[in-house]
Amino acid sequence: MTETDLLRGPVHDLHGELGATFAEFGGWQMPVAYAGTVGEHQAVRTTVGLFDVSHLGKATVAGPGAAQFVNATLTNDLGRIHPGKAQYTLCCSADGGVIDDLIAYYVADDEIFLVPNAANTAAVVAELAAAAPAGVTVTDQHRDYAVFAVQGPRSAQVLAALGLPTEMEYMAFADAAWDGRPIRVCRTGYTGEHGYEVLPRWADAEPVFRALLEQVRAADGQPAGLGARDTLRTEMGYPLHGHELSREISPVQARTGWAVGWRKPQFWGKAALEQEKAAGPRRILMGLKAIDRGVLRQGQPVLRDGEPVGETTSGTFSPTLKVGIALALLDTGAGLEPGAEVAVDVRGRRLRCEVVKPPFVPSRTS
């Protein structure tokens, strides 16, 4: 895919004005960094950062019984929440592989708003549309809404300055307005910090982003690119589809079984996942913290006593811990517990690492 083939978000030119460097994410050209990933990461941990994640998908399932239909297909149990709350969930295939992980917003019994990953939106919409009963529609709204994430300890201060709602529980959302423009405000995020995701209409994106940026800077924050978003989520052990989740990596292996409604009568992949859970997965997601100096990356062999016992799925330098960290799928048969020492083959060099159970840093989402 060439640069000219990449899709662009609603404030792409503004990112250029801000000095962003760009990279491809899910078929979209998105800002990877502005002043620098480490500084942007630290801003989110200490003050506040503003991300443009408008490449994320958006879709609406609507019609009589929409919530019931979504509950019978996606893994998590919508019965655990109510209108005004959101839920992390997964769209699985019959064999238990993950087509995508996504957020489901319970708007009403007849309306569920979904935010899938950019590259998987079309697949999720197609799967749901093909299975939808009469009267239930599944509409791809990828370019109807922008998504801006305001994340960090001062995120509430930023939204309050614009008159947007901030007093809500984690994973709650509210429909509001700024300057006459409708905005959905969600107490969600992908950083492990207190934060919000703000969804204005696509056409309203630039004035909303500029207003948020002004308040972020007033709070000693800065715009942050998707490079920082990745280091932040890796520190939290949050999975990224294509890395820790895929059609070959199940929720049981990726430690996202908490997002599966095991007691529900049905959801896609239920039989396969129940079987894997009962038997025990052949591999499990763990964290690795480098003992030796070095940076870990995806796809590197993990060794114990020179024998392969797994592979890294994501890796980075942790700006918080100031060491290399990784997420890795480790063979359960190897019996590796937190505290065990392994080695990662980094281009022929054996980098010693300690096995840890994620997250690497405490969550502060509440």
Swiss-Prot record:
It comes from the Bacteria. GO terms for molecular function: aminomethyltransferase activity; transaminase activity. GO terms for biological process: glycine decarboxylation via glycine cleavage system. GO terms for cellular component: cytosol; glycine cleavage complex. Its EC number is 2.1.2.10. It catalyses: N(6)-[(R)-S(8)-aminomethyldihydrolipoyl]-L-lysyl-[protein] + (6S)-5,6,7,8-tetrahydrofolate = N(6)-[(R)-dihydrolipoyl]-L-lysyl-[protein] + (6R)-5,10-methylene-5,6,7,8-tetrahydrofolate + NH4(+). Keywords: Aminotransferase, Transferase. Gene3D superfamilies: Aminomethyltransferase beta-barrel domains (3.30.70.1400), Aminomethyltransferase fragment (4.10.1250.10), Probable tRNA modification gtpase trme, domain 1 (3.30.1360.120). InterPro entries: GCS_T (IPR006223), GCS_T_bac (IPR022903), GCST_C (IPR013977), GCV_T_N (IPR006222), GcvT/YgfZ/DmdA (IPR028896), GcvT/YgfZ_C (IPR029043), TrmE/GcvT_dom1 (IPR027266). Belongs to the GcvT family. The glycine cleavage system catalyzes the degradation of glycine. The glycine cleavage system is composed of four proteins: P, T, L and H. This is Aminomethyltransferase. The lineage of its organism: Bacteria, Bacillati, Actinomycetota, Actinomycetes, Mycobacteriales.
